[in-house]
Regions:
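N-terminal pre-domain/capping segments
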Residues: 1-98
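Active-site acidic/histidine proton-transfer and metal-coordination neighborhood
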Residues: 65-66, 82-177
Length: 177
């Protein structure tokens, strides 16, 4: 077990206006920005798609490692684990795989995501679909060589969204690794 496995970390999810105000311009500057604030974690935002290349991510990872900063990745917001459309659920698995690739390049191991809405189905039916999609995602990660990655569903605040504490705990229970 290394230090990253147990150390409590504090960081931000993305950058604020202060990033540019302090003179930072590129995502390559994120480790310096994070360290300047005295933080040791950073959640890289891929909310609108995974657009960070692995080469650039590798450079960011090297700088972050020297500063004791650990990255995680927030997967795209358009994940829909419980969609009535099978293709959208399969797309959600693909988005998680893309996120895993960039997360690995950043030296991270946690992929944060929102599970999506219930749509026009009961919460119970939506949760069953989401649990199935989560199982598929875990299997896909393992098959693609990302078995060390942890999927981290977030709670959601709106009534129509899947993501109460109990629903998130059920999703987390899928991954037995």
């Amino acid at each position: 077990m290394n230090e990253c496995d147990w150390k409590i970390r504090f960081g931000t999810a993305g950058t604020s206006d202060s990033f540019e105000a302090k003179g930072y311009k590129s995502s390559l500057d994120i480790p310096a920005y994070t360290a300047e604030m005295g933080l040791n974690a950073f959640e890289y935002q891929c909310g609108h798609g995974v657009r960070l290349g692995v080469d650039k991510a590798g450079k960011m990872a090297a700088d972050a490692a020297e500063r004791g900063i650990l990255f995680s990745v927030h997967a795209p917001y358009y994940i829909s684990m419980s969609s009535l459309e099978e293709e959208k659920r399969l797309g959600s698995v693909r988005y998680l795989l893309q996120s895993a690739e960039v997360c690995r390049a950043l030296g991270g191991r946690r992929i944060i995501f929102h599970s999506g809405s219930c749509g026009k189905q009961s919460r119970e039916a939506a949760l069953e679909k989401a649990l199935d999609t989560m199982r598929r995602a875990v299997e896909a990660l393992d098959e693609a060589g990302y078995g060390d990655m942890t999927l981290c569903p977030e709670t959601m605040g709106k009534i129509g969204q899947l993501g109460t504490l109990d629903e998130v705990l059920a999703l987390c229970g899928v991954d037995k690794r």
